[in-house]
């Protein structure tokens, strides 16, 4: 009857064939007193959404990853049902424009929290800090079990719990490295690996960005999908980056997209890497538009269709202008072009 019923807040759940469990839940519900307020997990700005323009499909990243069916198409934008949304954070991790931003955690608040935690660690004499991201259920329980029955976390591992690690995107990963963490480890529930494939794509994008600023290392970002605390502990004490870039601390204020650019620009400066295009994986939300200038008639159809303002006209001359930092790679301009003189290419400028 419900999509993603197990992810919805405010419900008591039991197997329909378990009559004893159903009776216990009924008794438990009867004893509940007070009000329940459904949390709002996502702050959505339809003005920034690049889902569609003029009936031409563009970005559908959030629709593709939402496991609860809380997001539906609504014309040129999408609609997010707060009653269904369970706060997995997937939409916030993949949204290229910042139209869908998670409230817990907000990208800028996350950056400030890990920076503050890092400052305290370094002031206490800590060395080679590593960041461990875990959710409040599976991840927190694994860490607790490691502390209770094992040797606990490594001394240089700084843990931070999140409502859901599904929000971990390339923006959070590169921000952590820029602030000074030499490694970022994410613990996910192995029972949900089919839902968290987007995290692998986000890590691949973060690795490509790191390679572009001369800080690539396979062990820089580590994803652990284990339920056994001993196996988690073994991986935490395993591979480490061979070399870390010089930190480039900054104030993470603004949209996830803007924060990512600040982090990469800072790392490029600390690594003495000149301005150059960074090759990115297919589907990356950064890149350029290639235009066949010999056949383009400057009809400006693409300008009026571009949802991000990346394509602009010159009011004083027949000229088509492009802002690479604004391009979302949604592909609407390519679909709009009457003569098919434009194409999209995945890359980013540091």
Tell where the protein language model's regions lie, with residue ranges.
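Short beta-strand "wing" residues that participate in macromolecule-binding interfaces
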Residues: 73, 102, 313-314
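Conserved small/polar residues in nucleotide/adenosyl-binding loops
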Residues: 340-347
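Structured core of small recognition/catalytic domains
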Residues: 89, 96-100, 105, 166, ...
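Short low-complexity, flexible loop/linker segments enriched in glycine and/or proline
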Residues: 116-118, 199-202, 327
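Cysteine-centered iron-sulfur cluster-binding motifs in ferredoxin-type domains/subunits
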Residues: 45-69, 79-98, 288-309, 321-339
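Short glycine/acidic-rich loop motifs that flank beta-strands on beta-rich extracellular proteins
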Residues: 75-76, 317
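A contiguous, basic/glycine-rich beta-loop/short-helix subdomain that forms a polymer-engagement track
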Residues: 105-123
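Non-ligating segments of multi-cofactor redox enzymes
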Residues: 1-42, 46-47, 55-57, 127-314, ...
């Amino acid at each position: 009857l419900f999509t993603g019923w197990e992810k919805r807040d405010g419900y008591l759940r039991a197997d329909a064939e378990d009559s004893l469990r159903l009776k216990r839940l009924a008794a438990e519900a009867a004893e509940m007193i007070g009000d329940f307020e459904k949390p709002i997990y996502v702050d959505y700005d339809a003005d920034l959404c690049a889902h569609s323009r003029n009936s031409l499909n563009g970005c559908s990243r959030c629709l593709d990853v939402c496991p609860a069916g809380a997001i539906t198409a609504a014309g040129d934008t999408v609609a997010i049902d707060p009653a269904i949304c369970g706060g997995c954070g997937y939409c916030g991790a993949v949204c290229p424009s910042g139209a869908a931003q998670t409230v817990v955690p907000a990208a800028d608040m996350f950056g400030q929290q890990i920076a503050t935690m890092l400052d305290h660690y370094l002031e206490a004499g800590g060395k080679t800090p590593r960041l461990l991201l875990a959710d409040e259920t599976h991840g927190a329980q694994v860490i607790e079990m490691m502390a209770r029955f094992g040797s606990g976390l490594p001394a240089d591992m700084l843990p931070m719990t999140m409502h859901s690690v599904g929000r971990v995107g390339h923006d959070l990963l590169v921000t952590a490295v820029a602030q000074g963490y030499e490694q970022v480890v994410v613990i996910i529930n192995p029972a949900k690996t089919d839902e968290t494939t987007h995290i692998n794509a986000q890590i691949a994008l973060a690795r490509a960005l790191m390679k572009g600023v001369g800080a690539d290392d396979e062990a820089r970002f580590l994803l652990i999908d284990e339920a056994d605390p001993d196996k988690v502990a073994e991986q935490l004490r395993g591979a480490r980056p061979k070399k870390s870039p010089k930190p480039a601390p900054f104030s993470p204020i603004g949209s996830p997209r803007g924060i990512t650019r600040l982090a990469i620009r800072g790392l490029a400066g600390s690594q003495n890497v000149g301005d150059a295009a960074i090759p990115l994986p297919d589907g990356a939300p950064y890149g350029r538009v290639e235009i066949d200038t010999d056949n383009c008639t400057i009809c400006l159809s693409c300008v009026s269709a571009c949802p991000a303002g990346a394509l602009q006209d010159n009011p004083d001359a027949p000229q088509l202008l492009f802002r690479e930092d604004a391009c979302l790679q949604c592909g609407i301009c390519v679909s709009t072009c009457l003569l098919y003189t434009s194409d999209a290419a995945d890359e980013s400028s540091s």
